[in-house]
Structures are given as C-alpha cells and as structure tokens.
Design a protein with these regions (language model features):
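Conserved hydrophobic/aromatic packing and binding residues within compact polymer-binding modules
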Residues: 121-124
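Structure-specific DNA junction-binding interface
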Residues: 1-88, 180-213
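C-terminal extensions
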Residues: 88-112, 126-213
C-alpha cells in the first residue's frame, strides 16, 4: 500500500520514524500490517506481492495496524490493491456468491454487500439454484449486480474501518479492534474457508497467505 524508505514520521512506533517501513494488507484475512525489509535497499513497488509464510521472506512483520494508521497514499492505493486481490482470487469470490447463507431469519450474508437488497438477493438465489455462477461477470449478468468487484471492495473497506459491524464476511477483526467494539463481532471468514477447502480437495484455486503493498 505504501513504502517509506526513510521511515514514517507520523508512525506511533518510534523505530519506524527513521527506518524503512511498508504498510501492507494480507490477501486471506485482509489484516493491515506494518513490515520492515530484512535486506538493505529492498525495492518494493506498488501492488507487489510479498510472501510472508516462507523462510526467505524479504520482510518481517512489525505490528498490526488499523485503517486509521494508514498513510494518505496507502488509503488511496487500498481500493486498487483490493480489486487486484479479488480478481486474482476470482473463483473464491464467485464461490461466495454461490454459497453465502442466511445469517438470521431476516438477514442473508449477501445483503451485507453494498447494493444488494431483497429484490437482488432473490434474483441471485434463484439464478444460482438454476446453475452456479462461473465468474464475476456471470454474477453481474445473471445476478443483476452492477460492478460486483467494486461492491466487494466497498464491503471489505467497510469491514476494515468499522467498529460497529456485527458480521465480518472477509476481514478478520484483530484483537485491539475487538476491544473497542461494544459487541463482539462474528467472523465468517468466507475467503479463508474457501481457500482451506480448495487445498483439502486439491482444487485449482488461488491460495496461500501473502502481503500486498
């Protein structure tokens, strides 16, 4: 999201004010993190994918941060990076539209996506019953959604920002944020579940936790 070679003067951690630091987002739990390069003069470009769970990872995790901790540039980059993550994991997000279930008698998980009301919900449910959606374009055409990628981006950003949401479809709410919430949130973790299932069944779906700058 943002890479500051000379450090971040506004950072709450003193050691980040004079050393290189990057603000990144995970592509499974959508956790916002600050990381430091392990090697000098590491070249990190916008939207680079950095492997975290490998021995030779070029960065080390320093801390979990909140949306409010992001720099102005990181906030500006966030929608573009999220859109890339969604498109890179398109089959997994299509599965969300195919398998999302009711949360209560009156609320369906799909209704948490901005722009999905009762009428659109019924259309999506009817269409996926006839035939599972095969792509986000298919969701748009048969499900009646306009720009589903942007709608997913908006939902993920809302989950990153909010202290009031009860249900988290994609973002894992970190411990510090949960402490600030009046009510304990419910993490549904659709993307995590689909990735795990794809690994267990050997399906050809994108997987593995990584970070995006």
């Amino acid at each position: 999201l943002d890479y500051m070679r000379s450090g971040n003067q506004m950072d709450k951690h003193a050691f980040h004010r004079t050393r290189p630091v990057a603000q990144v987002i995970g592509d499974t739990y959508f956790t916002l993190l600050e990381v430091s390069p392990k090697v000098p003069d590491l070249d990190i470009k916008p939207e680079d994918r950095l492997e975290l769970d490998v021995e030779n990872s070029p960065v080390k995790v320093d801390s979990v941060i909140s949306y409010e901790d992001l720099t102005a540039l990181a906030k500006d980059e966030l929608p573009k990076v999220l859109e890339k993550i969604i498109l890179d994991n398109e089959k997994l997000f299509v599965e969300f539209f195919n398998q999302a279930a009711p949360l209560t008698l009156k609320l369906h998980a799909l209704e948490l996506i901005p722009g999905v009301g009762k009428k659109t919900l019924r259309q999506i449910l009817d269409e996926r019953k006839k035939k599972p959606f095969e792509s986000l374009k298919d969701v748009e055409e048969r499900g009646g959604l306009k720009a589903p990628v942007k709608m997913l981006v908006e939902r993920i950003i809302r989950e990153l920002q909010s202290l009031e949401e009860k249900y988290f479809l994609f973002v894992y709410p970190d411990e510090q944020r949960v402490k600030k919430m009046a009510e304990k949130p419910v993490y549904l973790g659709y993307l995590e579940k689909f990735k795990l299932r794809s690994h267990e069944t050997g399906a050809t779906l994108p997987g593995g936790e990584a970070l995006r700058r």
